[in-house]
Amino acid sequence: MSEKDRSNSRLPLHINIRTEIFKTKTNSLRKIWQNSFYLPHILKFLKINAKFKRQILFGILFIVFWICIYGISHFSNVEESPPQEMIPHEVDMLLNAFPTEGDGKATAILLNWSRIENLKTIVKHLCQYTMFKEIMIWNNNGDVHLSDQIFSEIRCRKLRYYNSPGNMHFIARYMACAMATTPYCYFQDDDWIIRHMRSMYANFLRYPDLIHTDTNADVYSLTNWKWCFFDDSIDLHACFSWVGTGAFVSKENVINFLKMTSITEMDPTEFAYGDMYFTTFMNQVPYQLENELQELPQENAFSAGEGRLRNKIFMHKALLHIYDHLTNRTGVFETKELYPTIYQRDVRSPCENDRCLFLTNKNSFPDVRTFRYKPSINISESERIHESYFGTEHFIKYPYSHAVDGKNWTVWKSSEVINKDDYIGLDLLFPMPFPLTFTLVVDHHRDYFSTLNIHISYNGMDWIQLAPLPKIIITQLSQTGLDGKTHLLSCSFRIRETGIRFVKLTSTREWEFPYGIHEFSFHAKPMN
């Protein structure tokens, strides 16, 4: 990719500086003397015994003199410290800085059947995010009437309800989105807490025509390998992805999907189970992020037990619909593969603190076009074929998210060695108004750092190579890597350019070892 110089535009910055009022130090001896219990009695004695005044005065001065000498020698280095909480600490300048692009442009859609307590937890979590104008709960349970009284302790003004006269199952979330007043919608089920909302939304805003979903490593290996279906001869390029573990979608795509359900003459049961059709009918690979999910109570889960087989049956029916229309060139489904295609993408996982996204060009699975889709092969058989060709155990054990999960003892390990022009990096979600310090903990040879190019970007497309390179400080840690012998290295460097959003570290040569990234993080704490 060509490198284009761009001016270093800076955003307007408002800094609120909190000042603390410190008490003026008081001489300790003087303070003790003034507050002494004996002072009034001494003065009274001097007044009554005036004739002894001179002798007593000299005596007191003599005693005070030696007390001062003693105090100077013992307390000259002691200062009265302010209370512990008033001592200034090193504060990250980004502590309360968050992306604001797209604020108020999304509606969160939740479905209710029986887990009211879960919904309360989810609503409280979602209400804090500024991207949501409203949080809509579609109630499929006719025996329950949702109202403000049920959610009174949440105190979320964004909350809205629709009490459906009947159970519309999963198609209800798409109908609710079509009713929304915002251009984007967010879906999730009632048995998860999705912790990386800002990260997923920031990437979605870059490519809003693509469905963005969130899942764990196990399911990621399905939705990016075993559940991908390609046939270039008819322009089939679809992958199935769950939306229940978090998904941002455009309202336009949802409305198009509802139109497709009518044109393809889906039967009422298929219509009710719309989740099994939505991502496939887009005929685009969803942009999926991988991370560790946080579960809520999941009794009677829809996809447990026999539900898994039922889901695969509907997944297969969705593929038969789209395959038939693409084969006959009916024009119902999109045939152009949108940018970025699956192999043009490099955003992999959200950082644990929801302040960045991990980037790398290294894919974890073979080319999805290795197998041409055949309607006669069902989903379970397709899974077996893919697994026999390439197992996913390595990725599930060492997934992308381990590079940015805040834990030095976990690791993302690439399945292949580092090649020339391979890179890792971070999307910082919005242009940074401060200089930043980056830290890497890796299981690499020390020479790796001497063959890096560091690039920065404002938009993720036009890159600027830093020259000269910033000073890289490398420290050997006591912790060892996966072999139990090689010590991990901690590398830190500072980028003083401001207004940047993307950073990547590119290898200028091939190495005989794979990526082993234990941690990749950044902060905006001032340098000492």
Predicted segments — roles?
Residues 101, 124-134:
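Short, acidic, metal-binding catalytic loop of nucleotide-sugar glycosyltransferases
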Residues 510-528:
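Exposed low-complexity, polar/acidic, P/S/T/G-rich flexible segments that act as propeptides
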Residues 157, 177-178, 192-268:
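Conserved catalytic core of nucleotide-sugar-dependent glycosyltransferases
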Residues 174-184:
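Active-site nucleotide-sugar/metal-binding loop of Leloir-type enzymes
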Residues 30, 47-77, 99-107, 117-122, ...:
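C-terminal catalytic/acceptor-binding lobe
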Residues 3-82:
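N-terminal signal-anchor transmembrane helix specifying type II single-pass membrane topology
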Residues 118, 162-172, 271:
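A short, glycine-/small-residue-rich helix N-cap motif at loop->alpha-helix starts
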Residues 111, 131-144, 162-163:
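Short beta-strand/loop segment that forms part of the nucleotide-sugar
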